[in-house]
Amino acid sequence: MSDGTGVRGRTMAEKIWEEHVVRRADGEPDLLYIDLHLIHEVTSPQAFDGLRLAGRRVRRPDLTIATEDHNVPTTDIDKPIADPVSRTQVETLRRNCAEFGIRLHPMGDREQGIVHVIGPQLGLTQPGMTIVCGDSHTSTHGAFGALAFGIGTSEVEHVLATQTLPQYKPKTMAVTVDGTLRPGVTSKDIILALIAKIGTGGGQGHVIEYRGEAIRALSMEARMTICNMSIEAGARAGMIAPDDTTFAYLEGRPHAPKGRDWEAALEYWRSLPTDPDAVFDEEVLLDAGSLSPYVTWGTNPGQGAPLDSVVPDPATFSDPIERAAAERALAYMDLQPGTPLREIRVDTVFIGSCTNGRIEDLRAAASVLQGRKVAPGVRVLVVPGSMAVKAQAEAEGLDRIFRDAGAEWRNAGCSMCLGMNPDQLAPGQRSASTSNRNFEGRQGRGGRTHLVSPLVAAATAVAGHLAAPSDLD
């Protein structure tokens, strides 16, 4: 549609994209200016080596922020890192940041944490920005109305050298979630339900904009959970239009605009939401009121179902590729079709990650664990997403609730989300995890992962099997 002048309305993604195009040429990707570049120890070393070989410097070190998160241990952080590969990567990041003048939040620093937790926490993430990081879950920052996506190591080098990035313009998808969530149903359940609905390739080539009354009702931290897992639906990025909830979260944060700059920023930010007459390439509808707690049963985030249901029978899948994938998944997960999901027992519960390691997530888990005990034989790791989140949780007494229940209270890091640090599953162990990926071996070779919300994770810790808080009453 157009406004009567022949000019079609634009989506939020289109507005931000067009405002950041540095150069455009027929048959070539657009060259985008990048407002914020986040880096960590895993995907940056080769990029810095490339700069040295070419004799280049970092063009905008002031727009580049580094943290240590993927490989860092979450215990004994005052001691040297035991794993030699992890230690080398962390030490290399420190040397590179010192050489090229990049601000680094090292292990133990109050502002250290998972890269997608500290960006918003510090007010670095702002509406209308282009944000990149050598990490799949950079889409988290889209919760603020930013265009944020993950990039590869060669692209990390390109951004370091030029503060630009060549990209082909993606398509747009609107996911509208109307209605009201029932008690015990969270933003994690929304995104797991969406991925189960459209599949892990349903958003391929698109930027997803999440809309609707259920999205508007979410806090910023809940919105970040949804945008974080956009990549698990195959999307390039996920976004939510900025509103008063966004502005209230940002105001007063260390890197947020101040004074007159704040007022000017608000004026710009309010211009970003999608125009009423804009047209999306694809549209998907979800009814929030029909959703219930979701869990995954397989080995990709799209293989999920309501907790009230049973392990599906691959024979019921009409698509032969999906049927084969389900058969392989059930063999790996050691599950039988028809088994009630609530009967699946776990060895480990992990509460943390860039998906669900923020203060609201920890409060939710603590509300379930308070006055209760972890089931015998179940190990529970609670890992805050940043050292600032850890400090806030301890100020609120959440750490005591976790410890009293029998959980382990750790320092900040990616931890058991991925098998790149000491926090891993042993072969054959099964976890309920608030993270974002349940691939084979993701949490350790031979480990089996069920993705859940913090509420379900905490209830599972008490019950010893997949459970919702209502099951404990």
Swiss-Prot record:
Q: Cofactor note from UniProt?
A: Binds 1 [4Fe-4S] cluster per subunit.
- List GO molecular-function terms, semicolon-separated: 3-isopropylmalate dehydratase activity; 4 iron, 4 sulfur cluster binding; metal ion binding
Biological process (GO) annotations? L-leucine biosynthetic process
Q: What does UniProt give as the signal peptide span?
A: none
Residues holding [4Fe-4S] cluster: 354, 414, 417
Which EC class does it fall in? lyase
Per its UniProt record, what Pfam families does this chain match?
Answer: Aconitase
Q: What is its EC number?
A: 4.2.1.33
> Keywords for this entry?
4Fe-4S, Amino-acid biosynthesis, Branched-chain amino acid biosynthesis, Iron, Iron-sulfur, Leucine biosynthesis, Lyase, Metal-binding
Which segments carry the region annotation Disordered? 425-448
**Catalysed reaction(s)?**
(2R,3S)-3-isopropylmalate = (2S)-2-isopropylmalate
Pathway membership: Amino-acid biosynthesis; L-leucine biosynthesis; L-leucine from 3-methyl-2-oxobutanoate: step 2/4
Listed cofactors: [4Fe-4S] cluster
What PANTHER family has UniProt attached to this entry? Answer: 3-ISOPROPYLMALATE DEHYDRATASE, HOMOACONITASE, MITOCHONDRIAL-RELATED
For this protein, the record's HAMAP family field holds: LeuC_type1
Biological role stated in the UniProt entry? Catalyzes the isomerization between 2-isopropylmalate and 3-isopropylmalate, via the formation of 2-isopropylmaleate.
Quaternary structure note? Heterodimer of LeuC and LeuD.
State the family it belongs to.
Belongs to the aconitase/IPM isomerase family. LeuC type 1 subfamily.
What is the recorded name of this protein? 3-isopropylmalate dehydratase large subunit
> Upper lineage ranks?
Bacteria, Bacillati, Actinomycetota, Actinomycetes, Acidothermales
What is the gene called? Answer: leuC
